């Protein structure tokens, strides 16, 4: 469970700050870092040197001083409104998840290297959105995002933020039921776009109820 996970990390010299309000009295962890390997072979956070999660990469949090978001606070902030509505299963390295997708036919790593991907289970029915162009991409698919992360953005800004292969024209609603197991993390630069948004992947599962909303511009810009 989360408490056990945090306790284990604290025992190895890691400051766990942000998970369920737990604050361990140890040396302050500047940001999430990857190094130690957990029981299941997945990465956990430690004080190892190396590249880390980038400051300021969550664009929708522009009013927050990123220098104040450290360690587990950063990961909690990624969850946003979902923070108290999910169960955290694992922290995984972006590299391990990218390898998983490569083994399933993806030739472009979807998650930013040297960042943390969170494996979560939804505690309640949850509504996400999905954008698409109707040609290269469609209403149904395995990648979704939170509505608040794209509301007010132009299609071009959304394409840049989520490194999409084509400019989206439409938006759909995606309802995932309680108990759904998904992953979330930072979008890797792809197709010449910067990425940096927070995406959710359905882990190749055929789950969710998809419903058309309509024009992305009308929905996002309030037309």
Set out the residue ranges of the language-model regions.
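Exposed boundary/loop context
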Residues: 6, 11, 33, 49, ...
């Amino acid at each position: 469970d989360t408490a056990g996970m945090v306790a284990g990390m604290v025992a190895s010299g890691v400051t766990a700050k942000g998970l369920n309000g737990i604050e361990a009295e140890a040396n302050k962890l500047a940001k999430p870092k990857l190094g130690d390997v957990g029981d299941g072979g997945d990465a956990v956070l430690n004080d190892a040197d190396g590249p880390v999660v980038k400051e300021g990469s969550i664009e929708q949090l522009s009013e927050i001083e990123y220098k104040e978001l450290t360690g587990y606070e950063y990961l909690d902030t990624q969850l946003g409104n979902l923070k108290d509505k999910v169960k955290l299963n694992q922290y995984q390295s972006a590299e391990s998840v990218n390898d998983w997708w490569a083994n399933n036919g993806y030739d472009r790593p979807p998650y930013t290297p040297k960042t943390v991907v969170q494996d979560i289970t939804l505690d309640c029915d949850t509504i996400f959105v999905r954008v698409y162009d109707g040609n290269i991409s469609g209403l149904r698919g395995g990648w979704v995002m939170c509505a608040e992360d794209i509301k007010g953005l132009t299609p071009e800004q959304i394409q840049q933020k989520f490194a999409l292969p084509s400019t989206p024209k439409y938006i759909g609603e995606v309802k995932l039921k309680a108990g759904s197991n998904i992953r979330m993390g930072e979008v890797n630069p792809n197709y010449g776009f910067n990425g940096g948004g927070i995406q959710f992947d359905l882990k190749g599962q055929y789950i969710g109820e998809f419903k058309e909303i309509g024009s992305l511009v009308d929905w996002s810009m309030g037309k």
